[in-house]
Amino acid sequence: MAKNKGVRIVITLECTECRSNPAKRSPGVSRYTTEKNRRNTTERLEIKKFCPHCNKMTPHKEIK
């Protein structure tokens, strides 16, 4: 029998300032992967994390 997938899903967090800021340290967009519990956190996640391209702590929002 196949197991149920469960409520934890893998999500990608992307830097919000890298997309709009042309004057950053290096080209590219910072992305992190993490898991979230779909039952407890139904809305999109937003966490402050370090962005190596901006070289500072920036808000990272959940993308697809």
UniProtKB/Swiss-Prot annotation:
Q: Which GO terms describe its molecular function?
A: structural constituent of ribosome
**Pfam families per record:** Ribosomal_L33
Q: Give the GO biological process terms.
A: translation
Keywords carried by this UniProt record: Ribonucleoprotein, Ribosomal protein
**Transmembrane segments in this chain: where?**
none
Decide whether keyword Transit peptide is in the record. no
Ribosomal protein keyword on record: yes
Entry's Gene3D superfamilies? Answer: Ribosomal protein L33
Q: Where is the signal peptide?
A: none
Assigned GO CC terms? cytoplasm; ribonucleoprotein complex; ribosome
Give the record's family classification.
Belongs to the bacterial ribosomal protein bL33 family.
PANTHER family in the record: 50S RIBOSOMAL PROTEIN L33, CHLOROPLASTIC, LARGE RIBOSOMAL SUBUNIT PROTEIN BL33C
What's this protein's name?
Answer: Large ribosomal subunit protein bL33
